[in-house]
Curated annotation (Swiss-Prot):
The keyword Glycosyltransferase does not apply. The HXXXXD motif is essential for acyltransferase activity and may constitute the binding site for the phosphate moiety of the glycerol-3-phosphate. Pathway: Phospholipid metabolism; CDP-diacylglycerol biosynthesis; CDP-diacylglycerol from sn-glycerol 3-phosphate: step 2/3. This is 1-acyl-sn-glycerol-3-phosphate acyltransferase BAT2, chloroplastic. Plastidial enzyme of the prokaryotic glycerol-3-phosphate pathway that converts lysophosphatidic acid (LPA) into phosphatidic acid by incorporating an acyl moiety at position sn-2. Utilizes palmitoyl-ACP (16:0-ACP) to produce phosphatidic acid containing a saturated group at position sn-2, which is characteristic of lipids synthesized by the prokaryotic pathway. In vitro, can use 16:0-CoA as acyl donor. Keywords: Acyltransferase, Chloroplast, Lipid biosynthesis, Lipid metabolism, Membrane, Phospholipid biosynthesis, Phospholipid metabolism, Plastid, Transferase, Transit peptide, Transmembrane, Transmembrane helix. Its main location: plastid. Belongs to the 1-acyl-sn-glycerol-3-phosphate acyltransferase family. It is an enzyme of class 2 (transferase). GO terms for molecular function: 1-acylglycerol-3-phosphate O-acyltransferase activity. The chain crosses the membrane at residues 113-133, 210-230. Widely expressed. It catalyses: a fatty acyl-[ACP] + a 1-acyl-sn-glycero-3-phosphate = a 1,2-diacyl-sn-glycero-3-phosphate + holo-[ACP]; a 1-acyl-sn-glycero-3-phosphate + an acyl-CoA = a 1,2-diacyl-sn-glycero-3-phosphate + CoA.
């Protein structure tokens, strides 16, 4: 086995069907006697530390596995030997069950990512001037929908993505008019989802974590567009976010949710949270499901600095009406899941 070819992090589960001492096992059995003398214990620990210099240990999503919760090699009152199981960088190379190896990033993808950031950054700086200039008039005449700001956002998103990937949009006839308040929901695969959805030109308010609002230019634009802030893992912030969204819908604006709550790391559709559908059920507005495919391959989660080649497909489903949040949630998720399965 070539040690130099071992990947950095192993992502396989902590238990395997193969014998623990087989040549392909990634678990190393180290028998240690708790009743050994101090000198033998010190020599053993010193040997282990010396061996660890050649093989880097890293956290791989699970904790180290011990047969005993507490282990002290210097205690002499217990003569029972026990086994310590450790995980190393060699595990990813030796175990065929490793499912998510680190992908090799091509130089062209890195260059495309740099160009994408430059185009998006320069266009944002230019267009933010128009948004700031028109903001007082937007507050006076269109305080809730803010169509002018969303037009600027559509222009910015289109300029940013047009040179790098094509977007195939299906079901444009299912989009309600911009004056009709709706609750839009979609699967979430990549940072590019925001750009793709903004390019549709609909005036909807996204939900975004508060940390993004402090970013210059981008945070200013989000505030002027009326993006709703949310502190993750804060119950009070979640309640305030839902109240704010319900108020916007009652005033005639539309809101956009990613019901999964976060980006999918493997492209699979996760479970939906019911907050968006509760708003739709209480206000009586329709739910418009949207399926996004391809963004996760072009810019994977955790690799926002690269941009692979590929195309994006957007499927806009027919609006769903209902008065029960559970039924709305199940129907919207089923529509998105069916379209993803048909394409894949």
């Amino acid at each position: 086995m070539d040690v130099a070819s071992a990947p950095g992090v192993s992502s396989h589960p902590p238990y395997y069907s193969k014998p623990i001492c087989s040549s392909q096992s990634s678990l190393i059995r180290i028998p240690i006697n708790k009743g050994c003398c101090f000198a033998r214990s010190s020599n053993l620990i010193t040997s282990l530390h010396a061996a660890s210099r050649g093989v880097t240990r890293r956290t791989s999503g699970v904790q180290w596995c011990y047969r005993s919760i507490r282990f002290d090699p210097f205690k002499v009152n217990d003569k029972n030997s026990r086994t310590v199981t450790v995980r190393s960088d060699l595990s990813g190379a030796a175990t065929p069950e490793s499912t998510y190896p680190e992908p090799e990033i091509k130089l062209s993808s890195r260059l495309r990512g740099i160009c994408f950031c430059l185009v998006a950054g320069v266009s944002a700086i230019v267009l933010i001037v128009l948004m700031i200039t028109g903001h007082p008039f937007v507050l006076l005449f269109d305080r809730y929908r803010r169509k002018f700001h969303h037009f600027i956002a559509k222009l910015w998103a289109s300029i940013s993505i047009y040179p790098f990937y094509k977007t195939d949009i299906q079901g444009l006839e299912n989009l309600p008019s911009s004056d009709t308040p709706c609750v839009y929901v979609s699967n979430h695969q990549s940072f590019l989802d925001i750009y793709t959805l903004l390019s549709l030109g609909q005036s909807y308010k996204f939900i975004s974590k508060t940390g993004i609002f402090v970013i210059p230019v981008i945070g200013w634009a989000m505030s002027m567009m009326g993006v709703v802030p949310l502190k993750r893992m804060d119950p009070r912030s979640q309640v305030d976010c839902l109240k704010r969204c319900m108020e916007l819908v009652k005033k005639g604006a539309s809101v956009f949710f990613f019901p999964e709550g976060t980006r999918s790391k493997d492209g699979r559709l996760g479970p939906f949270k019911k907050g968006a559908f509760t708003i739709a059920a209480k206000t009586g507005v329709p739910v418009v499901p949207i399926t996004l495919m391809g963004t996760g391959k072009i810019m994977p989660t955790g690799s926002e600095g690269i941009l692979n080649h590929g195309d994006v497909r957007v499927i806009i489903h027919k609006p769903i009406y209902g008065s029960k949040a559970d039924l709305l949630c199940d129907e919207a998720r089923n529509k998105i899941a069916e379209s993803m399965n048909l394409v894949s």
